[in-house]
Protein backbone atom coordinates (compact mmCIF):
# COMPACT_ATOMS: atom_id res chain seq x y z
CA UNK A 1 0.00 0.00 0.00
CA UNK A 2 2.84 2.37 0.85
CA UNK A 3 4.42 1.85 -2.56
CA UNK A 4 1.07 2.56 -4.23
CA UNK A 5 0.70 5.76 -2.24
CA UNK A 6 4.22 6.84 -3.18
CA UNK A 7 3.48 6.10 -6.83
CA UNK A 8 0.27 8.08 -6.69
CA UNK A 9 2.07 10.99 -5.04
CA UNK A 10 4.60 10.97 -7.88
CA UNK A 11 1.79 11.03 -10.44
CA UNK A 12 0.06 13.84 -8.57
CA UNK A 13 3.32 15.79 -8.56
CA UNK A 14 3.74 15.19 -12.29
CA UNK A 15 0.14 16.28 -12.91
CA UNK A 16 0.74 19.48 -10.98
CA UNK A 17 3.80 20.21 -13.11
CA UNK A 18 1.71 19.74 -16.26
CA UNK A 19 -0.97 22.02 -14.90
CA UNK A 20 1.58 24.74 -14.21
CA UNK A 21 2.86 24.53 -17.78
CA UNK A 22 -0.63 25.22 -19.09
CA UNK A 23 -0.97 28.60 -17.35
CA UNK A 24 0.06 30.57 -20.43
CA UNK A 25 -2.47 28.73 -22.61
CA UNK A 26 -5.24 29.30 -20.07
CA UNK A 27 -4.34 33.01 -19.92
CA UNK A 28 -4.59 33.19 -23.72
CA UNK A 29 -8.00 31.51 -23.58
CA UNK A 30 -9.22 33.95 -20.94
CA UNK A 31 -8.03 36.86 -23.05
CA UNK A 32 -9.95 35.43 -26.00
CA UNK A 33 -13.04 35.08 -23.79
CA UNK A 34 -12.76 38.80 -22.99
CA UNK A 35 -12.53 39.56 -26.71
CA UNK A 36 -15.59 37.43 -27.45
CA UNK A 37 -17.52 39.16 -24.68
CA UNK A 38 -16.62 42.53 -26.15
CA UNK A 39 -17.66 41.32 -29.59
CA UNK A 40 -20.98 40.04 -28.23
CA UNK A 41 -21.56 43.38 -26.52
CA UNK A 42 -20.86 45.14 -29.80
CA UNK A 43 -23.37 42.89 -31.57
CA UNK A 44 -25.95 43.74 -28.92
CA UNK A 45 -25.36 47.47 -29.38
CA UNK A 46 -25.77 47.06 -33.14
CA UNK A 47 -28.97 45.10 -32.57
CA UNK A 48 -30.38 47.78 -30.28
CA UNK A 49 -29.42 50.51 -32.73
CA UNK A 50 -31.24 48.80 -35.58
CA UNK A 51 -34.18 47.40 -33.59
CA UNK A 52 -36.51 50.24 -34.58
CA UNK A 53 -35.80 50.07 -38.32
CA UNK A 54 -37.79 46.97 -39.33
CA UNK A 55 -40.12 44.42 -37.77
CA UNK A 56 -37.68 41.66 -38.67
CA UNK A 57 -34.93 43.09 -36.52
CA UNK A 58 -37.33 43.21 -33.59
CA UNK A 59 -38.01 39.51 -34.12
CA UNK A 60 -34.30 38.72 -34.14
CA UNK A 61 -33.83 40.72 -30.94
CA UNK A 62 -36.51 38.73 -29.14
CA UNK A 63 -34.70 35.50 -29.95
CA UNK A 64 -31.17 36.62 -29.16
CA UNK A 65 -31.31 39.34 -26.52
CA UNK A 66 -31.35 37.10 -23.48
CA UNK A 67 -28.48 35.03 -24.79
CA UNK A 68 -26.41 38.14 -25.48
CA UNK A 69 -26.93 39.31 -21.93
CA UNK A 70 -25.83 35.91 -20.66
CA UNK A 71 -22.70 35.97 -22.77
CA UNK A 72 -21.70 39.52 -21.91
CA UNK A 73 -22.12 39.11 -18.15
CA UNK A 74 -19.80 36.23 -17.36
CA UNK A 75 -19.00 36.35 -13.62
CA UNK A 76 -15.39 37.12 -12.70
CA UNK A 77 -15.02 33.85 -10.83
CA UNK A 78 -15.96 31.97 -14.01
CA UNK A 79 -13.90 33.95 -16.49
CA UNK A 80 -10.77 34.19 -14.31
CA UNK A 81 -10.64 30.72 -12.85
CA UNK A 82 -12.13 28.66 -15.69
CA UNK A 83 -14.51 26.77 -13.44
CA UNK A 84 -15.27 26.87 -9.75
CA UNK A 85 -16.97 23.73 -8.48
CA UNK A 86 -19.64 24.80 -6.03
CA UNK A 87 -20.42 22.24 -3.36
CA UNK A 88 -24.15 22.25 -2.92
CA UNK A 89 -26.74 19.82 -1.74
CA UNK A 90 -29.45 17.70 -3.25
CA UNK A 91 -33.01 16.87 -2.17
CA UNK A 92 -36.44 15.24 -2.78
CA UNK A 93 -40.01 16.62 -2.71
CA UNK A 94 -43.67 15.66 -2.90
CA UNK A 95 -44.85 14.22 -6.23
CA UNK A 96 -48.25 15.97 -6.05
CA UNK A 97 -49.15 19.56 -6.80
CA UNK A 98 -50.84 21.33 -3.82
CA UNK A 99 -54.00 23.25 -4.70
CA UNK A 100 -52.44 26.59 -3.74
CA UNK A 101 -49.47 26.16 -6.04
CA UNK A 102 -49.33 27.72 -9.54
CA UNK A 103 -48.40 24.96 -11.97
CA UNK A 104 -45.19 25.05 -14.06
CA UNK A 105 -47.37 24.63 -17.14
CA UNK A 106 -48.83 28.09 -16.50
CA UNK A 107 -45.55 29.68 -17.59
CA UNK A 108 -45.55 31.82 -20.72
CA UNK A 109 -45.23 29.65 -23.85
CA UNK A 110 -43.78 30.61 -27.20
CA UNK A 111 -45.80 30.23 -30.37
CA UNK A 112 -45.65 27.08 -32.52
CA UNK A 113 -42.81 26.58 -34.99
CA UNK A 114 -42.97 25.03 -38.45
CA UNK A 115 -42.25 21.30 -38.34
CA UNK A 116 -38.99 20.52 -40.09
CA UNK A 117 -36.98 18.17 -37.86
CA UNK A 118 -35.08 16.63 -40.77
CA UNK A 119 -33.25 19.92 -41.32
CA UNK A 120 -30.43 20.70 -38.93
CA UNK A 121 -30.80 24.08 -37.28
CA UNK A 122 -29.04 25.75 -34.40
CA UNK A 123 -30.96 27.40 -31.59
CA UNK A 124 -30.27 29.23 -28.35
CA UNK A 125 -33.88 28.87 -27.19
CA UNK A 126 -35.15 26.53 -24.49
CA UNK A 127 -37.89 24.54 -26.21
CA UNK A 128 -41.09 24.04 -24.23
CA UNK A 129 -40.99 20.30 -24.90
CA UNK A 130 -37.79 20.00 -22.88
CA UNK A 131 -39.76 20.60 -19.69
CA UNK A 132 -41.45 17.20 -19.77
CA UNK A 133 -38.50 15.22 -18.44
CA UNK A 134 -36.91 14.40 -15.10
CA UNK A 135 -33.78 16.49 -14.45
CA UNK A 136 -30.88 15.70 -12.10
CA UNK A 137 -30.26 18.91 -10.18
CA UNK A 138 -27.63 18.05 -7.57
CA UNK A 139 -25.64 15.20 -6.02
CA UNK A 140 -27.71 13.72 -3.20
CA UNK A 141 -24.87 13.35 -0.71
CA UNK A 142 -24.17 17.09 -0.87
CA UNK A 143 -27.58 18.02 0.51
CA UNK A 144 -27.28 17.70 4.27
CA UNK A 145 -30.10 18.34 6.75
CA UNK A 146 -30.44 22.06 7.34
CA UNK A 147 -28.80 22.95 4.01
CA UNK A 148 -30.42 24.72 1.06
CA UNK A 149 -29.35 24.53 -2.59
CA UNK A 150 -30.63 27.30 -4.88
CA UNK A 151 -30.63 26.71 -8.64
CA UNK A 152 -32.39 27.87 -11.80
CA UNK A 153 -34.25 25.60 -14.21
CA UNK A 154 -35.74 27.04 -17.42
CA UNK A 155 -35.20 30.51 -15.99
CA UNK A 156 -37.18 29.86 -12.79
CA UNK A 157 -35.42 30.00 -9.39
CA UNK A 158 -35.87 26.95 -7.13
CA UNK A 159 -34.39 25.79 -3.84
CA UNK A 160 -33.72 22.26 -2.55
CA UNK A 161 -33.79 21.27 1.12
CA UNK A 162 -34.63 18.27 3.29
CA UNK A 163 -37.96 18.25 5.12
CA UNK A 164 -38.69 17.05 8.65
CA UNK A 165 -38.45 13.44 7.44
CA UNK A 166 -35.07 14.08 5.72
CA UNK A 167 -36.75 13.71 2.34
CA UNK A 168 -35.42 16.10 -0.33
CA UNK A 169 -37.93 18.71 -1.47
CA UNK A 170 -37.97 21.50 -4.05
CA UNK A 171 -39.95 24.75 -3.86
CA UNK A 172 -39.75 28.06 -5.70
CA UNK A 173 -37.00 30.30 -4.35
CA UNK A 174 -39.25 33.33 -3.89
CA UNK A 175 -41.28 34.15 -0.78
CA UNK A 176 -45.04 34.44 -1.28
CA UNK A 177 -44.96 37.64 0.79
CA UNK A 178 -42.43 40.01 -0.80
CA UNK A 179 -40.54 37.75 -3.27
CA UNK A 180 -37.41 37.59 -1.10
CA UNK A 181 -35.18 34.62 -2.08
CA UNK A 182 -35.97 31.90 0.45
CA UNK A 183 -32.47 30.48 -0.02
CA UNK A 184 -31.15 33.49 1.93
CA UNK A 185 -32.95 32.20 4.99
CA UNK A 186 -32.54 28.98 6.95
CA UNK A 187 -34.13 25.56 7.48
CA UNK A 188 -35.97 25.08 10.79
CA UNK A 189 -37.38 21.62 11.57
CA UNK A 190 -37.62 20.79 7.87
CA UNK A 191 -39.30 24.08 6.90
CA UNK A 192 -37.66 27.01 5.10
CA UNK A 193 -37.81 30.30 6.99
CA UNK A 194 -37.72 33.51 4.94
CA UNK A 195 -35.07 35.93 6.27
CA UNK A 196 -37.28 38.98 5.61
CA UNK A 197 -40.31 38.51 7.88
CA UNK A 198 -39.92 34.95 9.13
CA UNK A 199 -42.59 33.26 7.01
CA UNK A 200 -42.07 29.49 6.88
CA UNK A 201 -42.81 27.04 4.05
CA UNK A 202 -42.93 23.25 4.03
CA UNK A 203 -41.83 20.84 1.30
CA UNK A 204 -45.14 21.18 -0.56
CA UNK A 205 -44.68 24.95 -0.75
CA UNK A 206 -47.47 25.73 1.72
CA UNK A 207 -46.89 28.60 4.14
CA UNK A 208 -47.07 27.23 7.68
CA UNK A 209 -46.14 30.29 9.74
CA UNK A 210 -46.62 34.07 9.53
CA UNK A 211 -45.08 35.72 12.61
CA UNK A 212 -46.36 39.09 13.86
CA UNK A 213 -49.63 38.94 11.93
CA UNK A 214 -52.81 36.93 11.55
CA UNK A 215 -52.28 33.65 9.67
CA UNK A 216 -53.62 33.67 6.10
CA UNK A 217 -54.46 30.13 5.03
CA UNK A 218 -54.04 28.91 1.44
CA UNK A 219 -50.87 30.94 0.83
CA UNK A 220 -47.81 29.23 -0.62
CA UNK A 221 -45.22 28.94 -3.37
CA UNK A 222 -44.84 26.52 -6.27
CA UNK A 223 -43.27 23.10 -5.67
CA UNK A 224 -41.85 20.50 -8.05
CA UNK A 225 -42.17 16.71 -7.86
CA UNK A 226 -38.79 15.54 -6.60
CA UNK A 227 -37.13 12.17 -5.96
CA UNK A 228 -33.70 10.92 -4.91
CA UNK A 229 -32.23 8.17 -7.09
CA UNK A 230 -28.78 6.85 -8.05
CA UNK A 231 -27.05 9.54 -6.00
CA UNK A 232 -28.88 12.43 -7.67
CA UNK A 233 -31.82 14.63 -6.74
CA UNK A 234 -34.27 14.77 -9.66
CA UNK A 235 -37.10 17.23 -10.28
CA UNK A 236 -39.96 17.24 -12.78
CA UNK A 237 -40.70 20.74 -14.21
CA UNK A 238 -43.20 19.47 -16.80
CA UNK A 239 -46.95 19.66 -17.31
CA UNK A 240 -48.93 17.86 -14.63
CA UNK A 241 -47.65 14.96 -12.54
CA UNK A 242 -44.73 12.93 -13.94
CA UNK A 243 -45.70 9.75 -15.83
CA UNK A 244 -42.99 7.60 -14.24
CA UNK A 245 -39.81 7.64 -12.15
CA UNK A 246 -36.45 8.94 -13.42
CA UNK A 247 -34.52 6.68 -15.83
CA UNK A 248 -32.17 3.91 -14.71
CA UNK A 249 -28.96 4.74 -16.61
CA UNK A 250 -27.32 7.16 -14.15
CA UNK A 251 -25.99 4.73 -11.52
CA UNK A 252 -22.24 3.98 -11.74
CA UNK A 253 -21.64 0.66 -13.56
CA UNK A 254 -21.06 -2.43 -11.41
CA UNK A 255 -17.45 -2.65 -10.24
CA UNK A 256 -16.82 1.11 -10.47
CA UNK A 257 -16.08 3.50 -7.59
CA UNK A 258 -17.04 7.18 -7.75
CA UNK A 259 -13.91 9.35 -7.43
CA UNK A 260 -15.27 12.82 -8.20
CA UNK A 261 -18.59 14.68 -8.24
CA UNK A 262 -18.39 18.27 -9.43
CA UNK A 263 -20.98 21.00 -10.06
CA UNK A 264 -20.23 24.06 -12.22
CA UNK A 265 -22.39 26.91 -13.53
CA UNK A 266 -21.33 27.55 -17.14
CA UNK A 267 -22.33 30.69 -19.14
CA UNK A 268 -23.14 28.68 -22.29
CA UNK A 269 -26.41 27.40 -23.78
CA UNK A 270 -26.80 23.78 -22.68
CA UNK A 271 -27.19 22.40 -26.21
CA UNK A 272 -23.89 23.89 -27.36
CA UNK A 273 -22.16 22.33 -24.37
CA UNK A 274 -23.83 18.96 -25.02
CA UNK A 275 -22.73 18.98 -28.67
CA UNK A 276 -19.19 19.69 -27.50
CA UNK A 277 -19.27 16.71 -25.12
CA UNK A 278 -20.60 14.43 -27.88
CA UNK A 279 -17.66 15.31 -30.16
CA UNK A 280 -14.23 13.68 -29.80
CA UNK A 281 -12.76 14.77 -33.13
CA UNK A 282 -11.80 18.12 -31.59
CA UNK A 283 -9.73 16.63 -28.75
CA UNK A 284 -6.19 16.67 -30.29
CA UNK A 285 -6.70 20.27 -31.45
CA UNK A 286 -8.38 21.72 -28.37
CA UNK A 287 -7.14 19.78 -25.36
CA UNK A 288 -3.43 20.13 -26.07
CA UNK A 289 -2.51 20.95 -22.47
CA UNK A 290 -4.73 18.39 -20.73
CA UNK A 291 -5.91 14.85 -21.51
CA UNK A 292 -5.14 14.92 -25.27
CA UNK A 293 -1.64 16.35 -24.89
CA UNK A 294 0.64 14.54 -27.32
CA UNK A 295 -2.16 12.76 -29.16
CA UNK A 296 -1.30 12.29 -32.86
CA UNK A 297 -3.78 13.59 -35.42
CA UNK A 298 -5.71 10.54 -36.72
CA UNK A 299 -6.00 10.00 -40.44
CA UNK A 300 -9.72 9.53 -39.88
CA UNK A 301 -12.09 9.80 -36.92
CA UNK A 302 -15.31 7.81 -37.08
CA UNK A 303 -18.29 7.20 -34.83
CA UNK A 304 -19.86 3.75 -35.24
CA UNK A 305 -23.44 3.92 -33.99
CA UNK A 306 -24.60 0.83 -32.11
CA UNK A 307 -27.91 2.48 -31.22
CA UNK A 308 -29.61 5.58 -32.53
CA UNK A 309 -28.02 7.78 -29.85
CA UNK A 310 -25.02 5.67 -28.81
CA UNK A 311 -21.92 4.03 -30.27
CA UNK A 312 -18.14 3.64 -30.32
CA UNK A 313 -15.40 6.02 -31.42
CA UNK A 314 -12.63 4.94 -33.80
CA UNK A 315 -9.61 5.04 -33.34
CA UNK A 316 -10.28 6.02 -29.71
CA UNK A 317 -11.32 3.32 -27.18
CA UNK A 318 -14.34 5.31 -26.07
CA UNK A 319 -18.02 4.38 -26.05
CA UNK A 320 -20.50 7.24 -25.75
CA UNK A 321 -24.22 7.90 -25.61
CA UNK A 322 -26.69 10.76 -25.36
CA UNK A 323 -29.58 10.15 -22.98
CA UNK A 324 -32.58 12.53 -23.06
CA UNK A 325 -32.98 15.16 -22.02
CA UNK A 326 -29.44 16.34 -21.23
CA UNK A 327 -27.10 13.53 -20.13
CA UNK A 328 -23.95 12.25 -21.85
CA UNK A 329 -22.35 8.97 -20.74
CA UNK A 330 -18.91 7.79 -21.83
CA UNK A 331 -16.60 4.90 -20.97
CA UNK A 332 -12.90 5.29 -21.80
CA UNK A 333 -10.55 2.31 -22.10
CA UNK A 334 -7.09 2.81 -20.57
CA UNK A 335 -3.81 0.95 -21.08
CA UNK A 336 -2.58 2.49 -17.83
CA UNK A 337 -3.81 5.36 -15.67
CA UNK A 338 -3.99 8.43 -17.91
CA UNK A 339 -3.13 6.56 -21.16
CA UNK A 340 -5.67 5.41 -23.75
CA UNK A 341 -5.33 2.32 -25.96
CA UNK A 342 -5.72 3.51 -29.56
CA UNK A 343 -7.15 1.05 -32.05
CA UNK A 344 -9.23 -0.82 -29.45
CA UNK A 345 -12.82 -0.66 -28.29
CA UNK A 346 -13.44 0.42 -24.72
CA UNK A 347 -14.82 -3.00 -23.82
CA UNK A 348 -11.53 -4.64 -24.91
CA UNK A 349 -9.44 -2.67 -22.40
CA UNK A 350 -8.56 -3.79 -18.89
CA UNK A 351 -9.02 -0.46 -17.12
CA UNK A 352 -11.81 2.03 -17.60
CA UNK A 353 -12.84 5.56 -16.70
CA UNK A 354 -16.59 6.21 -16.72
CA UNK A 355 -17.96 9.74 -17.08
CA UNK A 356 -21.44 11.19 -16.64
CA UNK A 357 -22.18 14.76 -17.70
CA UNK A 358 -25.51 16.46 -16.96
CA UNK A 359 -26.07 19.68 -18.94
CA UNK A 360 -29.11 21.07 -17.16
CA UNK A 361 -30.70 24.14 -18.84
CA UNK A 362 -30.69 26.62 -15.97
CA UNK A 363 -31.70 29.58 -18.15
CA UNK A 364 -31.10 30.90 -21.66
CA UNK A 365 -27.36 31.07 -22.22
CA UNK A 366 -26.51 29.22 -18.99
CA UNK A 367 -25.97 25.58 -18.01
CA UNK A 368 -25.77 23.85 -14.64
CA UNK A 369 -23.15 21.17 -15.30
CA UNK A 370 -22.95 18.10 -13.07
CA UNK A 371 -19.95 15.81 -13.61
CA UNK A 372 -19.36 12.38 -12.06
CA UNK A 373 -16.17 10.39 -12.67
CA UNK A 374 -15.81 6.69 -11.76
CA UNK A 375 -12.99 4.14 -12.14
CA UNK A 376 -12.97 0.33 -12.16
CA UNK A 377 -9.45 0.31 -10.70
CA UNK A 378 -7.56 2.18 -7.96
CA UNK A 379 -10.52 1.99 -5.62
CA UNK A 380 -8.24 2.92 -2.72
CA UNK A 381 -7.14 6.16 -4.41
CA UNK A 382 -10.38 7.97 -3.52
CA UNK A 383 -9.27 7.86 0.12
CA UNK A 384 -6.00 9.74 -0.54
CA UNK A 385 -6.17 13.17 1.14
CA UNK A 386 -6.92 16.06 -1.24
CA UNK A 387 -7.07 13.83 -4.34
CA UNK A 388 -10.53 15.29 -5.02
CA UNK A 389 -8.90 18.72 -5.29
CA UNK A 390 -6.64 17.38 -8.02
CA UNK A 391 -9.59 15.90 -9.97
CA UNK A 392 -11.46 19.20 -9.76
CA UNK A 393 -8.41 21.14 -10.94
CA UNK A 394 -7.95 18.85 -13.94
CA UNK A 395 -11.66 19.03 -14.79
CA UNK A 396 -11.44 22.82 -14.61
CA UNK A 397 -8.53 22.91 -17.05
CA UNK A 398 -10.38 20.67 -19.54
CA UNK A 399 -13.56 22.74 -19.33
CA UNK A 400 -11.55 25.94 -19.68
CA UNK A 401 -10.16 24.72 -23.01
CA UNK A 402 -13.69 24.00 -24.26
CA UNK A 403 -15.29 27.11 -22.80
CA UNK A 404 -13.43 29.59 -24.99
CA UNK A 405 -14.66 27.72 -28.09
CA UNK A 406 -18.32 27.31 -27.17
CA UNK A 407 -18.51 30.91 -25.96
CA UNK A 408 -17.21 31.88 -29.38
CA UNK A 409 -19.87 29.75 -31.07
CA UNK A 410 -22.55 31.34 -28.91
CA UNK A 411 -21.40 34.83 -29.88
CA UNK A 412 -21.48 33.87 -33.57
CA UNK A 413 -24.98 32.40 -33.23
CA UNK A 414 -26.19 35.63 -31.65
CA UNK A 415 -24.85 37.36 -34.75
CA UNK A 416 -26.90 35.03 -36.98
CA UNK A 417 -24.43 32.25 -37.83
CA UNK A 418 -25.39 28.56 -37.88
CA UNK A 419 -23.22 25.97 -36.11
CA UNK A 420 -24.47 23.25 -38.47
CA UNK A 421 -23.73 24.76 -41.87
CA UNK A 422 -21.25 21.99 -42.85
CA UNK A 423 -21.66 18.81 -40.75
CA UNK A 424 -19.15 15.99 -41.27
CA UNK A 425 -19.33 12.20 -40.69
CA UNK A 426 -17.54 12.42 -37.33
CA UNK A 427 -20.31 14.79 -36.17
CA UNK A 428 -22.80 11.89 -36.28
CA UNK A 429 -23.68 11.69 -32.58
CA UNK A 430 -23.92 15.46 -32.14
CA UNK A 431 -26.02 15.67 -35.33
CA UNK A 432 -28.42 13.06 -33.98
CA UNK A 433 -28.67 14.97 -30.71
CA UNK A 434 -29.50 18.17 -32.61
CA UNK A 435 -32.14 16.38 -34.69
CA UNK A 436 -33.64 15.09 -31.46
CA UNK A 437 -33.74 18.68 -30.16
CA UNK A 438 -35.41 19.76 -33.41
CA UNK A 439 -38.08 17.09 -32.89
CA UNK A 440 -38.68 18.32 -29.34
CA UNK A 441 -38.96 21.90 -30.60
CA UNK A 442 -41.52 20.84 -33.22
CA UNK A 443 -43.56 18.74 -30.79
CA UNK A 444 -42.76 15.52 -32.67
CA UNK A 445 -40.94 13.67 -29.89
CA UNK A 446 -43.17 11.15 -28.14
CA UNK A 447 -42.65 10.03 -24.55
CA UNK A 448 -42.72 6.37 -25.59
CA UNK A 449 -39.88 6.83 -28.09
CA UNK A 450 -37.34 7.61 -25.38
CA UNK A 451 -35.79 4.13 -25.29
CA UNK A 452 -36.42 2.83 -28.78
CA UNK A 453 -35.83 3.80 -32.40
CA UNK A 454 -38.96 5.17 -34.07
CA UNK A 455 -39.72 5.60 -37.73
CA UNK A 456 -38.92 9.27 -37.26
CA UNK A 457 -35.42 8.40 -36.01
CA UNK A 458 -34.90 5.88 -38.80
CA UNK A 459 -35.54 8.56 -41.43
CA UNK A 460 -32.85 10.92 -40.14
CA UNK A 461 -29.88 11.63 -42.41
CA UNK A 462 -26.69 11.95 -40.35
CA UNK A 463 -25.09 14.72 -42.39
From Swiss-Prot:
Keyword Metal-binding attributed: yes
Major place of residence: plastid
Question: What is this enzyme's catalytic activity, as reactions?
Answer: chlorophyllide a + 2 NADPH + 2 O2 + 2 H(+) = chlorophyllide b + 2 NADP(+) + 3 H2O
Q: What is one term from the GO cellular component aspect held by the record?
A: chloroplast thylakoid membrane
Provide the Rieske domain boundaries.
134-235
Q: How does it sit in the membrane?
A: Peripheral membrane protein
Q: Where is the composition biased (Polar residues)?
A: 92-106
Per UniProt, Fe cation binds at: 275, 279, 282, 287
Task: Show the InterPro entries listed in the entry.
Answer: Cholesterol_7-desaturase, PaO, Rieske_2Fe-2S, Rieske_2Fe-2S_sf, Ring-hydroxy_dOase_2Fe2S_BS
EC no. given is: 1.14.13.122
* Biological process according to GO: chlorophyll biosynthetic process
Q: Compositional bias (Basic and acidic residues) at which positions?
A: 113-122
For this entry, the protein name equals Chlorophyllide a oxygenase, chloroplastic
Species of origin: Dunaliella salina
